[in-house]
């Protein structure tokens, strides 16, 4: 929920494993940079499997007691971590019974952005750090979603962000946020248009390449006046978008891509490029809905 003064928080899904704090650290740092409150969310759905033959399932009341006992401890530890890292950030918590992806989707309605991890943990846990959370959340959330990889991503200097451009309204929204993120960190920005020549060889490749450059230039035009402090590099790169963006992410602070989002089935709406970079990027990935 928004704070009393109307500021929408940075929401982060809290992993039950205290050794996995990269998403929480990223969210706390982002809240501090933006002057926003931080909301820590932990959720678990009641287990539906994993019981031995003849073993009775717990009642909802029993499961609720377990959830609150463990969940309160998980959130207390997460709050201590966040407050020690960014003491001036206002922190709130939420403990919920339900599937993490859908709990976070509800939280996203009043958030500036939502942050989750992407490590692959045991499937016997309900967790925020799995593709089963990241993919449906990025497909349905009405706000930007940040997926932070485990283990920690190490960047090289000079620092830069990467944004994928394809001329669509989705990539235009991604460019806007990418400029913001770069400006907040004093980083440069690389805007990339991935170009694949026609497999049939029937197109004028020089004309097609010129068109790609035109679209890229028009997409980034005007943003430099809003963020003149951001050093911008833009280029058209030959290759599949997922491969181009994944390669560019290797030493980046973050990768920003647009997504259709907020609709039906995950695989149909998230898009192959967004899904591909979520699986393969080396750095935090920010998906931006329109």
Model-derived features: positions:
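Structured core of small recognition/catalytic domains
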Residues: 188-257, 265-278, 284
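A short acidic, glycine-rich active-site loop
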Residues: 59-73, 207-211
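Glycine-rich, Arg-bearing micro-motifs that act as flexible, cationic patches
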Residues: 113-136, 158, 254-280
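Short, structured interface segments
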Residues: 134-153
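Structural beta-alpha unit
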Residues: 1-5, 19, 61-65, 80-114, ...
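Short beta-strand elements of ligand-binding domains
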Residues: 115-118, 145-151, 287-289
């Amino acid at each position: 929920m928004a704070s009393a003064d109307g500021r929408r928080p940075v929401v982060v899904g809290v992993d039950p494993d205290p050794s996995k704090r990269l998403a929480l650290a990223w969210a706390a740092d982002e809240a501090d940079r933006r002057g926003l409150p931080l909301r820590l969310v932990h959720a678990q759905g009641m287990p539906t499997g994993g019981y031995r033959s003849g073993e009775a399932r717990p009642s909802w009341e029993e499961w609720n007691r377990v959830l609150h006992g463990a969940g309160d401890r998980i959130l207390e530890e997460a709050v201590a971590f966040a407050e020690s890292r960014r003491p001036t950030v206002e922190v709130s918590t939420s403990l919920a019974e339900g599937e993490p992806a859908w709990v976070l989707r509800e939280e996203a309605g009043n958030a500036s952005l939502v942050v989750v991890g992407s490590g692959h943990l045991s499937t016997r846990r309900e967790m925020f750090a799995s593709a089963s959370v990241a993919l449906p959340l990025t497909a349905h959330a009405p706000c930007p979603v940040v997926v932070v990889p485990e283990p920690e991503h190490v960047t090289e200097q000079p620092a830069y962000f990467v944004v994928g451009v394809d001329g669509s309204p989705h990539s235009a929204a991604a460019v806007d946020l990418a400029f913001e993120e770069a400006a907040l960190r004093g980083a440069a920005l690389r805007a990339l248009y991935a170009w694949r020549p026609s497999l049939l060889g029937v197109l004028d490749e020089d004309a097609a390449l010129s068109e790609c450059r035109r679209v890229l230039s028009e997409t980034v035009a005007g943003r430099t006046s809003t963020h003149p402090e951001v050093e911008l590099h833009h280029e058209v790169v030959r290759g599949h978008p997922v491969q181009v963006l994944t390669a560019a992410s290797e030493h980046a602070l973050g990768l920003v891509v647009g997504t259709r989002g907020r609709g039906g089935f995950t695989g149909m709406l998230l898009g192959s490029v967004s899904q591909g970079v979520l699986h393969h990027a080396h750095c935090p990935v920010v998906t931006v809905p329109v």
